[in-house]
């Protein structure tokens, strides 16, 4: 692994495997929604966060769906996801592909924080 990739923190984040992805969909420990996203979360007992992105076909054609996934991947890389949790992010609106990136990132970070804030209450 190059030093550049380790500096970005890629060692802390990992994508979910299919069986873990399915487990979160069947039994999410936490679920929060905003206007443009839904986040499912579940403790994983590991020392790193894992994430997945689920984009439904109704959001648009392959070009739109792939653009949404690229943008979400970058937002998740920039977000400080806490270790010990699995996250699945689902966009709820095709406008995620064209909306202002900074605004979307702020909304997603707030939603992730809200998802984990349930722990205290």
Where in the sequence are the language-model features?
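Positively charged, solvent-exposed patches that mediate nucleic-acid binding
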Residues: 1-121
């Amino acid at each position: 692994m190059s030093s550049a990739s380790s500096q970005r923190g890629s060692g802390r984040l990992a994508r979910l495997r299919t069986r873990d992805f399915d487990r979160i969909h069947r039994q999410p420990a936490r679920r929060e929604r905003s206007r443009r996203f839904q986040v499912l979360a579940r403790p994983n007992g590991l020392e790193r966060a894992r994430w997945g992105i689920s984009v439904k076909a109704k959001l648009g054609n392959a070009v739109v769906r792939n653009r949404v996934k690229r943008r979400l991947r970058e937002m998740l890389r920039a977000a400080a996801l806490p270790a010990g949790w699995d996250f699945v992010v689902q966009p709820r609106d095709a406008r995620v592909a064209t909306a202002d990136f900074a605004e979307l990132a702020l909304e997603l970070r707030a939603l992730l924080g809200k998802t984990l804030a349930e722990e205290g209450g």
